[in-house]
Structure formats: C-alpha cells, structure tokens
Amino acid sequence: FFIISFFPCEKKSYLRGNEVFMKHYDIIIIGAGPGGIFSAYELATKRPNLKIAVFEAGNRLEKRKCPIDGKRVTKCIHCKTCAIMNGFGGAGAFSDGKYNITNEFGGTLYEYIGKNKATELMEYVDEINMAYGGEGTRLYSSANSSFKRVCLQHNLHLLEASVRHLGTDKNYEVLSNLYNLLKDKVSFYFMTPVQNVAIMDNGDYEIITENETYTCEKCIISVGRSRSKWMEQICHNLEIPTNSSRVDIGVRVELPAEVFAPITDELYESKIVYQTEKYQDRVRTFCMNPKGAVVTENTNGIITVNGHSYENPALHTKNTNFALLVSKHFTEPFKDSNEYGESIARLSNMLGGGVMVQRFGDLIRGQRSNPKRIAESFLTPTLDATPGDLSLVMPKRILDGIIEMIYALDNIAPG
C-alpha cells in the first residue's frame, strides 16, 4: 500500500532503559526495487527536508553477486537472500533493462489516474533514466509497424508500445548513478528485511526488523514478487482488502536469433497476443531478449528462469529468448493464485532438480529430452538445465495453449 506524506513532522525521541535514541523517520520505504527507488528519488529531490529511510532485504548494487560462475558453481545453491532477485534495483537490476511506455500491458495504473497521466509518468521515468546514464539508447516503437498487419493475418495481435532498451550493462549504470545521488539524501538499510508493519496508537507506523524497531509517519511498501506472500500477510494484519489476481504460467523459449531477427531488429520487444482456438485462453509473448541469455532466479526457494540481453554487441549470444505466458483468472472460492503458480514451479524443480529444458520436437512427440538429444540440436542452450518432459509438469490446458501459440508464431517467424 502507498501512503506518502508531503508535510514535514517533528522528529521524536524514544526511551529504552536510560538510553534516548532516534529511530523515527518521516517516511520509510520498504523495498529498493524500481518502486522504492523512484519514490525515494521524488521525495528526496522535491522535499529534501524530509527524513527518509529505505529498507531492503538484499545487498547494495555493487555487492549483488550470484555465486554461479559456470565453472565451480553451475547451478543455484539456494542462498538465503538471492542476489539476482533482491538488492538495490530489485529483480530487474540485471535484466535487459526494458522500459515499456504503454497502457496496453504491464499494469493497470491508468485505471486510477487515467491513460494520459499514466503515459506522462512513464515518459517522466524515461527522462530520468536518460539523465542518469541511459542517453544514446534506442527507443523502439510498434505504432506504425508493418508487422501489425502480418500478425492479424494469423490471428495474432501486436500490442502498441514504445520500448526503451537500456541493456543489462546500461541499466546497471543508471541504477548505480541513482544510488550515488540518493545515498547522501536517504538512509539505506541493506540486508535488513522487514518482518512486520504495525499501526501504533498515535497513528504512526512501527517497522519491525530482526534486530531493531523503527517508526514513521508514512510508509511505502514496494517489495515485488519475491515477498508477495509477506505482503499478503501484512495486508491481512492491517485489514487491507485484497483480491485474487491473475497468474501467468508459461515457459521461456530459446531459438536461433536469426529466426526472430526481422521482428527484433525493428521492434526489439514485441508483445504479441493470441487467443487459442481450443479454450479461448489468451497467450502472449513476454520479455523478449534478442541475442540474449537465459538465467536462473530464486523466488521463495523455487528456481525459475529469466532472460538477459546486453546493449554491448560484444556480449551478444547467437540465441534469442522470450517467455510465452498463459494468463488465468480465478474465481471464488479459490483465492491463492500465487500459490497455484508456485506449486507448478516446485513440481518442475522436483522432477528436474532445478530448471528443466526440453526440445520442442520432443514435446510434440511426447518424448522426454535427454542430454544426447539436446546435444544433437542445432541450437546450444545458454543455460545448463536438466533435460526432461514438460508435459509431466504443466497442466494440459496451459501446455496446449503454449503449443498452439508456437505454431501461430511460426507463421510470422518461420523456424
């Protein structure tokens, strides 16, 4: 929940034994992902008189180091705090740095403030990124793309958006510059996960960590996917109503970069939506990474995958990867959509000992992939994963939708 005060308040002292100590802030921000960073940026630059603190479960940017080096450590070792998912910059700190400027996907902010205002804010974020290291990067647009017509001919819909691609390298630079700006204006508490948030008798908020308790007049919570379960509990404790949102379930597809080059060279990130004939479910592409790599993530102890790509051509690979997601909305009495998605990921981890990979041809034939069959492929996966059988993991309806979508995409990008 987002509660921001724009009025300075007096600083308060608290007594512990005979010791008087100061642990009160005007505003405390929980989470140093994009939501927390830009909240701190706005408050610190426009109201510098406010006393602000940011609490983050992970580490500062330069100390976020995943132990997987491809040599001594090749698979996730389940660190207590995942350096990829947690820390300054959030889960997207090492992603390919795509910022979408559109109301057609990526959130429903426009439902609260209107489409024009939502677009203005997205463009404002883009201006900040450009000012802090992103200058010179390309802004792609699908507004007048000829691929719209090509997609429609095959029952595919190319969503309209402008996409700023920073690349993993430039994205890191922007985040580093923002941190250097904020570190002298805001108190950062790294490796300090918040355990609980409570409302005090005077209306202030009590922020409880493992070793200390802090107070504030206003609190912003922006913890992201990795602490979504914790957020649900906080909402329950504070009697904030919630509802079961959709869950996106799918796979990450990797193929030779040449196959999608006609699309990625023009659009870079193409959000393509398809409605399946069999179930009328919506399937969409997500997080496209031209000449990128597939990487692992640890979310609540579950190993999943993401995609990275770099602006620097020297760091390009021969493959392009993207996610194919099927969106499901649940109705009463079911309320735990997050748990539904996580249970599928846990099953994949159980069967594959981590991330599972399968050749599309093997999937269609109902045949489990094995190391020999993976090695015989013309494509070399960028991630070392366990060959397996996705049909033993994914619900049939979800898998049918993904297969149908792949055949539809083959009409616009043969291969």
Identify the residue ranges that each predicted region occupies.
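Ligand/cofactor-recognition surfaces for anionic moieties
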Residues: 20
